[in-house]
């Protein structure tokens, strides 16, 4: 979030089905939402998959309609620029199997026709709008400090911070409710609901900001393991939920760990 302030726009590479697996639709939308949330502005997709992709072996070939679907998904989530990668498959090198709109022969094909259709549709649509920016009334606090801490101390086998964020995002995605990702320090008053999954580490400014939001009538949902560490990644000696105990109005005396093999 802080780094994005130094740039005119942020971007990411969107590969949905390639050598290393397939991404679920909600995962792609979540990642789009995260990029949009960094600056609260439209973002770019610098590389949008346009063919079968892989290094040592080919990934799945996008079936008819998927390039169009993925492009519209990007735009609907706030992208104002989508760049297909690549134009034509390279005949040599590490990514010689990384197909683009055109195959190695450079001849127009099914994917070329599909991208041409999308281009014509976008040209027509652009007459009425520049970019779509979903107006989110729900926010999820994304804490890189908590994510990095949890990557070292897993807490529970099979628990991953990134997957947990997706679990909180998915129900809103299923209902068509836009979600922003925020820091604990930024303005929360525009949101009706703020979720704080596994917010283990929070700055004094962030803690105060969340308290102010809640005291003004905002709704905050904490998950397990929230408020348990300081900003130096040290465990606190206060009873769980630590720095949020007063705001939550509870103390956790004991807990049970549920794992996939329990």
Listing of model-derived features with the role each one plays in the protein:
Residues 4-260:
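Carbohydrate-binding surfaces of carbohydrate-active enzymes
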């Amino acid at each position: 979030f802080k780094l994005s302030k130094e740039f005119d726009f942020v971007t990411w590479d969107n590969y949905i089905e390639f050598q290393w697996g397939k991404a679920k639709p909600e995962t792609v939308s979540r990642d789009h939402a995260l990029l949009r949330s960094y600056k609260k502005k439209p973002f770019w997709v610098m590389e949008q998959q346009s063919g079968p992709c892989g290094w040592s072996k080919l990934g799945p070939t996008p079936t008819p309609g998927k390039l169009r679907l993925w492009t519209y998904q990007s735009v609907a989530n706030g992208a104002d620029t989508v760049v297909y990668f690549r134009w034509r498959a390279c005949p040599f090198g590490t990514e010689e199997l990384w197909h683009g709109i055109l195959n190695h022969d450079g001849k127009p094909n099914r994917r070329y026709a599909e991208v041409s259709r999308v281009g014509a549709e976008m040209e027509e649509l652009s007459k009425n709008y520049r970019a779509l920016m979903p107006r989110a009334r729900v926010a999820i606090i994304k804490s890189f400090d908590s994510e990095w801490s949890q990557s070292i101390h897993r807490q529970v086998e099979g628990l991953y911070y990134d997957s947990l964020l997706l679990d909180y995002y998915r129900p809103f995605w299923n209902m068509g409710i836009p979600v922003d990702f925020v820091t604990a320090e930024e303005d929360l008053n525009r949101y009706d609901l703020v979720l704080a999954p596994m917010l283990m580490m929070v700055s004094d400014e962030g803690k105060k900001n969340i308290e102010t939001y809640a005291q003004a009538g905002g709704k905050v949902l904490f998950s397990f393991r929230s408020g348990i560490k300081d900003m130096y990644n040290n465990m606190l000696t206060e009873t769980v939920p630590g720095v949020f105990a007063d705001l939550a109005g509870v103390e956790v005396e004991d807990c049970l760990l549920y794992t996939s093999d329990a």
